[in-house]
Amino acid sequence: MTQITPTCAPPPGPTITDRTSLRLSKAIAGKSRGWKTGLLFAGPAVIASIAYVDPGNFATNIQAGSRYGYTLLWVVAAANLIAMLFQALSAKLGIATGRNLPELCRDHFSRPLVIALWIISEIAAMATDLAEFLGGAIGLALLFRLPLIIGMVATAMITFALLLFEKRGYRVMELVIGALVATIGLCYLAEMFIAPVDWTAAAWATITPRLPDATALTIATGIVGATVMPHAVYLHSGLAQNRAAAATDDASRHRLIRFSNREVILALALAGMVNMAMVIMAASAFHIGHSDVAEIEQAYHTLTPLLGAAAAAIFLISLITSGISSSVVGTMAGQMIMQGFVHIRIPVWLRRLVTMVPAFIVILAGVNATDALVISQVILSIALPAPMIALIYFSGHRELMGPFVNHRVTQWVASAAAAIVLGLNMVLLIQAFGFTIPGLPVAP
């Protein structure tokens, strides 16, 4: 394998303008400073972070909090740290090589392996879109007292409208997604002031690993699937690839990677806190007396008498915002996956239309919407090792990465994280076939 000189080929989706690229170049060279300059580097991780607060997180976090209280907060924290590591590696890969992860897979793997990776990634993208689309539709249906199908149609129309911002340029899309992320964060900040939280118990559970039974393990695996997202790993490399055009040598690429790492830490720390807030809210509101709450609709109807109409409305607003924004980001990732792996690009409206079809089929077939959300997260968890292993492989090769190759410790930690995810998936499959895990009690 020979080292690739960054080509900075634009990925699918919006691109940065020449003006933004020039401002980035000046900032990287140290010719401009200040908070406005810092905001230039905010974008890729913000867009990727929306994948970590999508409706799938709502479903799994509600189940975790209502059934096990604060017990599984440590899983959320650990999954968020793993997500930070792999999003940082993905961004570094895009900056160092000027290529995104699907493109590198296509260039360096055999054709059968590329096709297999593409199929796995497309299945994961559809599972992702199922969760995102259904989440937004459920929120709209509950808030405005609509049939779920009408909520799905409304979600589709809003998503199509937001995707039009792609034509306005990369920064416009970043600002739109950033505003939606901020809305979700503010909603859960408000919930924390309403819910009666035992902060000491929550803090202790965050640093104390414990799995009470087999169902807890299943939910924990779902949390990992909802927090570390395959399409976000692929997408971030392409979003960072856009920024690579502003870095013309190794020194400037090194500075750009440093800025990128800071953004990843900030954006995903916010996403992690939102996820922990979801579990804390569910634990505080439902665990004592309402531990059977496992569905989004149940959570909404139970919140109203427990914490008031305002808390229930805030919950729905955050769910709608999450579903619509993550659906837009999922479509962007789907474009990148298809073009990167098999060099096929279809119009964004057609991509959006195709990925919506499974959601309509699931609901028309009578499948419970929240069950579909949780199952989609398990599918994502099973699909996740493919991009994780590919990312470790490429970012650990000096011939490809040059001076930006992973440090040996980074490579070990990333490999250990991937092994943990693989292990969780194997346990999940064993449970799915009706076998029990020795030493792990079955839930009552």
From Swiss-Prot:
* Principal location listed in the UniProt entry: membrane
Q: Which GO terms describe its molecular function?
A: cadmium ion transmembrane transporter activity; manganese ion transmembrane transporter activity; metal ion binding; symporter activity
Bilayer-crossing regions? 39-59, 69-89, 109-128, 146-166, 175-195, 215-235, 264-284, 304-324, 346-366, 372-392, 417-437
Q: Where in the cell is it found?
A: Cell inner membrane
Q: Which GO terms describe its cellular component?
A: plasma membrane
Q: What InterPro entries does the record tag this protein with?
A: NRAMP_fam
Which UniProt key words apply to this protein? Answer: Cell inner membrane, Cell membrane, Ion transport, Membrane, Symport, Transmembrane, Transmembrane helix, Transport
Membrane topology label:
Multi-pass membrane protein
Please give the biological process terms from Gene Ontology that the record holds. Answer: iron ion transmembrane transport
Going by the entry's taxonomy, the superkingdom of the source organism is recorded as Bacteria
Give the similarity note. Belongs to the NRAMP family.
Q: What does this protein do?
A: H(+)-stimulated, divalent metal cation uptake system.
What HAMAP family does UniProt report for this protein, alphabetically? NRAMP (MF_00221)
Cross-referenced NCBIfam families: nramp (TIGR01197), Nramp_1 (NF037982), PRK00701.1 (NF001923)
Its name, as the record gives it, is Divalent metal cation transporter MntH
- Origin species, per record, is Granulibacter bethesdensis (strain ATCC BAA-1260 / CGDNIH1)
